[in-house]
A protein has these predicted regions:
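Flexible, low-complexity junctional segments that flank or bridge functional domains
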Residues: 1-138
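Short, well-ordered, mixed-charge alpha-helical segments that flank or form enzyme active sites
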Residues: 17, 109-110, 148-150, 215-216
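Stable alpha-helical elements in mature extracytoplasmic
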Residues: 23-26, 120-127, 150-157, 216-220
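Alpha-helix initiation/capping motif
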Residues: 36-42, 150, 177, 215
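Residue-level signal for short segments within beta-strands and strand-turn junctions
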Residues: 56-58, 209, 219
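Residue-level signal for short, function-critical loop segments
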Residues: 104, 145, 210-212
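P-loop NTPase catalytic core of nucleic-acid-dependent motor ATPases
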Residues: 141
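Gly/Ser/Thr-rich loop/hinge elements
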Residues: 148-206, 212
């Protein structure tokens, strides 16, 4: 007999975005719009692009209830670069040097339709060279919000993660139905000469996944 209403949770915040400027953080609950608790009747109100006032809150223990905490004003949306690299870190635990990368989509550059732009791929290689220079020997790859993208980006990422002695070997077989069987191909891991500067020669890999992990992400897993 209790009332029900829609709420939303912040999964992550892009750098230099209106959400970051407003102080939104991962894990914040949006309880209402224009300061009215439970006013999210349609999620499109959060996608409208206009300036809105949000009522934020937090969970109350294990009661499945929420309490309001603060109100923030979110400025009108504007274009910001949605890079695949949300967070990268290196943690030391005993004799372990643990690399962490949250990689949110497989794209070679900012323009998903311009395959000639490989600036993201170049950055990925440089990032792994940094991991290697810091003697990373364990790795956590966070693909919880990665819905896929370009297969050649997955090919590069896999080549940077695998054991050195399997570089150049088959990564996957791309097999089409009988109408396009002429497109079937075996996609190999890149050669040692192409990724040696950043290949971590890992013996194992920890992958974080979620309900939206799909497509090219599954190739890595």
């Amino acid at each position: 007999g209790g009332s029900t209403y829609k709420i939303a949770i912040v999964l992550y915040v892009l750098k230099d975005s209106p959400a970051e400027e407003a102080g939104l953080k991962r894990g914040d609950w949006i309880l209402g719009v224009i300061g009215s608790l439970g006013s999210i009747q349609d999620y499109d109100v959060l996608r409208s692009g206009g300036s809105v006032s949000l009522q934020l809150g937090k969970e109350i223990g294990n009661t499945k209830g929420f309490v309001s905490t603060r109100r923030v004003t979110l400025n009108a949306s504007r274009t910001v670069e949605d890079t695949p690299f949300l967070k990268d870190s290196v943690y030391t635990y005993g004799n372990k040097r643990i690399g962490y990368l949250m990689y949110n989509h497989f794209a070679s550059g900012p323009d998903e339709y311009d395959y000639s732009d490989t600036s993201y791929n170049l950055y990925l290689q440089q990032l792994f060279e940094k991991f290697k220079s810091r003697n990373v020997n364990e790795f956590v790859l966070d693909l919880r919000y990665n819905g896929g993208g370009l297969v050649n980006c997955a090919q590069l990422l896999a080549s940077l993660l695998v054991r050195e002695n399997v570089l150049g070997e088959p990564l996957c077989i791309m097999e089409y139905n009988d109408k396009n069987s002429n497109k079937n191909e075996t996609l190999p891991l890149l050669k040692t000469t192409e990724v040696m500067a950043g290949n971590l020669n890992l013996q194992r890999l920890f992958v974080l996944t979620g309900s939206t992990t799909a497509s090219a992400s599954e190739l890595i897993i």
